[in-house]
Amino acid sequence: MAQTLVEKIFSKASGKEVKAGEFVMANIDLAMIHDITAPLAIKAFREILGSDAKVWDKSKVIMAFDHQVPADSVHAAENHKMLRKFAEEQGILNYDVKGGIAHQIMVENHVEPGMLIVGADSHTCMYGALGAFATGIGSTDMGFVLAMGKLWFKVPESIRFNVHGKLEKHVYGKDIVLKLIGMVGADGANYKACIYSGEVVEKLGMSDRLTMCNMAIEMGGKAGIVEPDKTTLEYLKAMGRPYEGELLKSDEDAEFQEVELDVTGMEPQVAAPHRVDNVVGISEVEGTRVDQVFIGSCTNGRYEDLKIAAEILKGEKVASNVRLIVIPASHREYRRALKEGLIEIFVDAGALVEAPCCGPCMGGSFGLIASGEVSVSTSNRNFIGRQGSPEGKIYLVNPAVAAATAIYGEITDPRKIK
């Protein structure tokens, strides 16, 4: 029976051969919890097994603090205190405030091809860039996973996005995925695994692949996946954990829904307020005055993203009307950017460089916008109130557009900068 990669992963996890549409109880390889969703998950876990219960496998549970870091309220501080105690009692790995954004920590240190992974956060789908099936679940479901190490799933159908052509300068994975979201809509891939394929994707580095998989949820996807290849293995080796196991891949005659995209001549894409699928070419919004620019998040806070922005900002100054916030996605990414002089470039330009965390992306910690203000952000969502006032506006862009915009104080096409 011909199978997609997704069907193969669920077959392995459930111990039987399965097809899309079947309901299965599957064993979980890794579970991720963070400071916002973990408290409710722990509450559910204790309701299932009791206050003295132990998680099913302490080696498979990873905790990190990233949303409210450093603690921005007494409530957040108390949550952190409770979570530290839970992690210590359970013997689970807790990165605390020292690792960065949970999703970036996971791909750097834990995710392997072929794994079935759940996280109590919707952008867990990012891990699929390494050939895993990773999906976000609610805190109650996570409580069950912590207790039992398994969860029921409907095996998703797969939609394959075949990306062809040649990318223009300053057009990246962010632009590809925004274009695809605009094409199919916010519910165009509901409960489907979004498989990114084609010669353009094959040539993309891991950072761009992570960006694309991260945003699969923005078109309703259950997961975002790039089938594992040489780039996957090179990334894992660079992270200090070379992979020599089996590389599961889709059979050639497996069934997919197919979507084609030719990126030849495509300009940088922008998700305009207030929907991620409200996607336009940058030429339609050029000149829009901006108050804040955010370069970071699990979507675009990696070294490669920071380098793109730094190359544009080098020797320049942030416009007088703009606040530029830069946040590396992890401490590993921060150290590399620091070593190679990128942080100095940002500081010299007038940016606020913050410690690795979610920052303005989730709108609950710092870097919020006021009513009537406009934010240009490399993050993944632009819903009303996402970064502060519900009367503010958010435009989602790639790092080059963000950097150019910070310099000129209005949405700017980086291809026009000399």
From Swiss-Prot:
Q: InterPro entries given for it?
A: Acnase/IPM_dHydase_lsu_aba_1/3 (IPR015931), Acoase/IPM_deHydtase_lsu_aba (IPR001030), Aconitase_4Fe-4S_BS (IPR018136), Aconitase_4Fe-4S_dom (IPR036008), HAcnase/IPMdehydase_lsu_prok (IPR011826), Homoacnase/IPMdehydase_lsu (IPR006251), IPM_dehydratase_rel_enz (IPR050067), IPMI_cat (IPR033941)
What Pfam families does this protein's entry cite? Aconitase (PF00330)
Q: Does the keyword Iron apply?
A: yes
- Pathway, according to UniProt? Amino-acid biosynthesis; L-leucine biosynthesis; L-leucine from 3-methyl-2-oxobutanoate: step 2/4
The record's keywords, sorted A to Z, are: 4Fe-4S, Amino-acid biosynthesis, Branched-chain amino acid biosynthesis, Iron, Iron-sulfur, Leucine biosynthesis, Lyase, Metal-binding
Keyword Lyase (UniProt): yes
Ligand binding ([4Fe-4S] cluster) = C298, C358, C361
Name what cofactor the protein needs.
[4Fe-4S] cluster
GO: which molecular function terms?
3-isopropylmalate dehydratase activity; 4 iron, 4 sulfur cluster binding; metal ion binding
Listed under catalytic activity are: (2R,3S)-3-isopropylmalate = (2S)-2-isopropylmalate
Top EC class, one word: lyase
The record's comment on cofactor binding reads: Binds 1 [4Fe-4S] cluster per subunit.
Purpose: Catalyzes the isomerization between 2-isopropylmalate and 3-isopropylmalate, via the formation of 2-isopropylmaleate.
Please name the HAMAP family in this protein's record: LeuC_type2
Describe, as the record does, how this protein assembles with itself and its partners. Answer: Heterodimer of LeuC and LeuD.
Q: Which family does it belong to?
A: Belongs to the aconitase/IPM isomerase family. LeuC type 2 subfamily.
Protein name according to UniProt: 3-isopropylmalate dehydratase large subunit 1
Its taxonomic placement starts with: Archaea, Methanobacteriati, Methanobacteriota, Archaeoglobi, Archaeoglobales
